[in-house]
Amino acid sequence: MSEHAGEIRVAIVGVGNCASSLVQGVQYYRNADENTTVPGLMHVKFGPYHVRDVNFVAAFDVDAKKVGFDLSEAIFASENNTIKIADVPPTDVIVQRGPTLDGIGKYYADTIEVSDAEPVDVVKVLKEAEVDVLVSYLPVGSEEADKFYAQCAIDAGVAFVNALPVFIASDPVWAKKFEDAGVPIVGDDIKSQVGATITHRVMAKLFEDRGVTLDRTYQLNVGGNMDFLNMLERSRLESKKVSKTQAVTSNLSGALAGKVEDKNVHIGPSDHVAWLDDRKWAYVRLEGRAFGDVPLNLEYKLEVWDSPNSAGVIIDAVRAAKIAKDRGIGGPIEAASAYLMKSPPKQLADDVARAELETFIEG
């Protein structure tokens, strides 16, 4: 039996707000009773793994205020501005310099100081730290960088959780690479616990289920974190808009079903409002026709702290990836991806996806 039996050794790429909420969240729920239900997790004990079994053993970043520092310090450093939910003791994990590639956009480059340390050999670090699962939290638009780390995961035999909208698990070529290597992947693009995507998806489906014709809809998002600042660079946004849009329209059967590019569907980030910090405000409108073609419109606003809203979902994704690794399963984990991600290889209705994931957990 391995000396690390019973734990999940996790590496993080990108020590931003999402990583901060993840690390704090594991600390927050460390002593949770496995027989209770807590906000934001499917189960305190997910298969054989309790939240406290998630152990951070490596981290990569490019920010000079994070590289070279203990993970417990780095999660509160530089531009990180999410809500604090836990004191994190020193981890003895020093954040290492990853390769930049296309991970730094124009607005990032204007805001942070990039570390002048030499990039490390990522595959070597993953192997030496005996990492089980690599979580990619790179900024939106980091196509080349995300694929670099995905390949590192394959080369090191490490399960991959792809939290950003770069299409890897949902790309048949990449899916086959993971399958052939016997390496599991959960992706792509993390769904929040209750965010703009899931509420919009549910309300749009409700219109159809109640016989209302959905003619047009929009979802506008503003936030104050580095994610929203980065997304002001419209060229980095394409995959994000596609991911958020198909997450809503894939669940429909009417005129807007499966639409990504359509005049009557507009879903995406809109602006950066610095004083919101890590809060995100979503403004959603649905316009339809009810009985007699009479207009029926719904408008709502959602206010959330952005990063904690997805941290629990990542904890579940990490545990699903480790269970797959334990069972020798390679390639996309379809049930986990469908329930936990916006752009999985196979879209399923949320209730169906959850039921399939429960079945997967039970084995």
From Swiss-Prot:
Cofactor(s) required, per the database record: NAD(+)
A GO term, aspect molecular function: inositol-3-phosphate synthase activity
InterPro entries cross-referenced by the UniProt entry: MIPS, Myo-inos-1-P_Synthase, Myo-inos-1-P_Synthase_actino, Myo-inos-1-P_Synthase_GAPDH, NAD(P)-bd_dom_sf
Reactions performed catalytically: D-glucose 6-phosphate = 1D-myo-inositol 3-phosphate
Location in chain, cross-link Isoglutamyl lysine isopeptide (Lys-Gln) (interchain with Q-Cter in protein Pup): 65
Domain of life of the native organism: Bacteria
Chain residues that bind NAD(+): 70, 129, 149, 192, 227, 240
Function: Key enzyme in myo-inositol biosynthesis pathway that catalyzes the conversion of glucose 6-phosphate to 1D-myo-inositol 3-phosphate in a NAD-dependent manner.
Additional record remark: Was identified as a natural substrate of the M.smegmatis proteasome.
UniProt protein name: Inositol-3-phosphate synthase
Annotated organism of origin: Mycolicibacterium smegmatis (strain ATCC 700084 / mc(2)155)
Native organism taxonomy: Bacteria, Bacillati, Actinomycetota, Actinomycetes, Mycobacteriales
Gene from which the chain derives: ino1
